[in-house]
A protein has these predicted regions:
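C-terminal non-catalytic regions of proteins with extracellular/luminal or membrane-system context
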Residues: 1-300
């Protein structure tokens, strides 16, 4: 970071070396806030609600990140603004699931908008003003600490990578997302307790909108099995449905489990195999919860 004084010229020399990727240089500048004593925390303190939008652009297709942290200056800005106004809404725009632990409890709410297109501003405004009830779910896992992840040069997913194999506590699980309303799930019910061969099994759950707003919920169906756990597999998503439920109403949501959902690669015979045994199918709002019913697959 180089402070620049008005009216002065500066000679900047940048050296870069790239073996395979074309090197790019980007210059950005930030006007000082204190010309007239106006600072972000002062504006926040004088406001009923503070909205702080932070963007992260430290990664791209042509290069990797050094770590999964927000910048120290950004974290300090969050601390100053939320201290000045506890009623702060933090909007985060990033293409990666970055670490949120240093500030996750500071704002009143966090809206993660990823990297939007030209309609991003309108979409965000509609959510903030209550014209749209948010229903998005995280397509990745937000870990509590980057040390929970295996080395990034290891592509072995079975070593604790993703919601399928990681067994520790996370910040926000795969499939997580809040709404302005509140949904409740009944216990799932299956139409049969045993299946074999190419049979299918239906699992049904009732989702009720117990809040004060109409809303959409993304109902998710996960499958797990003790025999999978031997190889480290915790669970896998086999289906999801977006359903609209008016306030005070309920909807029945069903999923079909088929033999293809049970398949695992058998290294001994080098083919996909559906192992006989007990399975659990769980219908939940995200991968961090469990609302399961069991059935038995009898094999071919």
């Amino acid at each position: 970071e180089l402070p620049l004084v008005k009216g002065q010229e500066y000679q900047v020399e940048v050296e870069a070396c790239g073996m395979k990727a074309q090197q790019t240089v980007r210059l950005s500048w930030r006007p000082p806030f204190d010309d007239k004593g106006i600072t972000p925390e002062k504006l926040a303190k004088e406001s009923d609600v503070a909205i702080l939008f932070l963007r992260d652009d430290n990664s791209s297709e042509g290069r990797d990140r050094k770590d999964l942290h927000w910048g120290e200056a950004q974290i300090e800005l969050i601390r100053k603004v939320t201290e000045a106004n506890p009623n702060t809404i933090l909007i985060l725009g990033s293409g990666s699931p970055l670490m949120l632990a240093p500030f996750v409890r500071l704002p009143k709410a966090i809206l993660n908008v990823w990297i939007g297109g030209q309609g991003e501003a309108r979409a965000i405004t509609h959510i903030l003003l209550g014209k749209v009830n948010p229903s998005g779910k995280t397509p990745v896992t937000f870990f509590a600490d980057e040390r929970q992840l295996p080395p990034m040069d290891s592509y072995d997913v079975t070593k604790g990578r993703s919601y399928q194999y990681f067994k520790g506590d996370v910040m926000f699980p795969f499939g997580y997302g809040l709404s302005y309303t509140r949904f409740e799930y009944s216990r799932p019910v299956v139409d049969k307790s045993r299946m074999s061969g190419s049979d299918t099994l239906s699992v049904e759950v009732t989702v009720s909108n117990k809040g004060g707003y109409d809303g959409e919920e993304i109902v998710q169906c996960y499958l797990s099995a003790p025999q999978w756990a031997v190889g480290g597999l915790k669970q896998k998503l086999i289906g999801h449905k977006r359903v609209f439920i008016a306030k005070g109403e309920s909807r029945k949501v069903s999923f079909t489990v088929c033999r293809e959902d049970l398949l695992r690669w058998n290294v001994n015979v080098k083919e996909w195999t559906a192992l006989a045994g007990k399975y659990e199918v769980s219908v939940v709002p995200h991968s961090g919860e469990k609302n399961a019913v069991s059935f038995v697959y009898e094999g071919k």
